[in-house]
Amino acid sequence: LDAIPKVATGAFPVGFADINSLIKFLDQNPGAPVTAVMMVYDKPPFAVVGRKSLGISGPGDLEGSVLGAPPPDGAWAQFPSFAKANNIDIGKIKVEPVGFPTREPMLAEGKVDSVTGFSFSSYLNLVRLGVPENDISTILMADHGLKLYGNAVIVNTEYAEANGDTVKAFLGAVAAGWKDAIADPTAAAAALVKRNPAADAALEERRLELAINANVLTDYVKANGMGGIDSARFSAAIKQLSETYDYKAAPDAALYFTDAYLPAGGFPVK
C-alpha cells in the first residue's frame, strides 16, 4: 500500500503494488498521477490455505469450519467475493480473528481449520512449522471465481509522459528478469541472497517457484505474453470489487491500467 502514494506524489517514479488497492486509491484520490503499466501477478495470490486432515480440501468444505483471518489481510478482504462465487454462506463459518504472526501457527496446531493469506507465504510457513506438504490444501481464489488481478508495476504518469523510453526500457528489464528467473529459479534465488544475505536461498527458491507456477506464468501469460491484461476480465474484476468496496465515482478502467509502454503482444517469458 505504501508504494502507491509514494509513486503518486513523485517520491518514486515506479513501484510495485496490488492493482485493486490502486483502483481504490484513485477512486479516493481522483486525478492522482499514478497508473499500472505492467501486470505481473496475472492471478493474485489471495488464498484460503487449510489442512486436509482437518477436513479442508476445497471451497465446499469451509461451511461448518473455523477460519483464521487477520482483519487487515488482503486475502480476507476478498473473501466475500470468493464466498459469493462459490455459494458459501459466511454465516456458517466461524471466523477467528488472528494476528499475522499467529496465523499459520494456529493452523499448524489445529486451533483453526484454515486461514486466509498469500498462497505461497502461508504454504511455506506451514512447511517450516512441520505440517506435511501432502496435508496442506491451497485454495487459490483466482481458480474459484475471483476475477481480480494482482500486483503490477505502477508509474507516476507525469514521469512516464516525460520519460516514455525509460519506462519502456525498465519494463523490458523487469520482463527479462522474470524470464531468467523462470528459466533458472536457483540462480534467481542466489541473486536475491546476494542482495539480502539474511535470506534463505532454498526457501526463496521454493517461494519463487510457487509464485511462478500459480501467479505469474498462467495459461493467459503463456498464450499472450507477460504484462498485459484481458479487458473483459478487467471489467469483470472492477465490477466484482464493488462487492467489497463502495466506489465514490463511476469506475473507469482506463484510469487504472495502460498498455502504452508494453510491446505489442506483451513480453514472451517462456
Segments predicted by a language model, with ranges:
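Conserved C-terminal helix/tail region of periplasmic/extracytoplasmic solute-binding proteins
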Residues: 232-270
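Second-shell loop/turn segments in exported
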Residues: 9, 65-69, 109-113, 158-160, ...
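Surface-exposed patches in mature extracellular/periplasmic domains of secreted proteins
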Residues: 34-36, 95, 181-192, 251-253
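Secondary-structure end/capping motifs
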Residues: 162-245
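Short, glycine-/small- and polar/acidic-enriched structural segments
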Residues: 1-99, 103-109, 113-120, 139-141, ...
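Pocket-lining segment of extracytoplasmic ligand-binding domains
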Residues: 101-105, 111-200
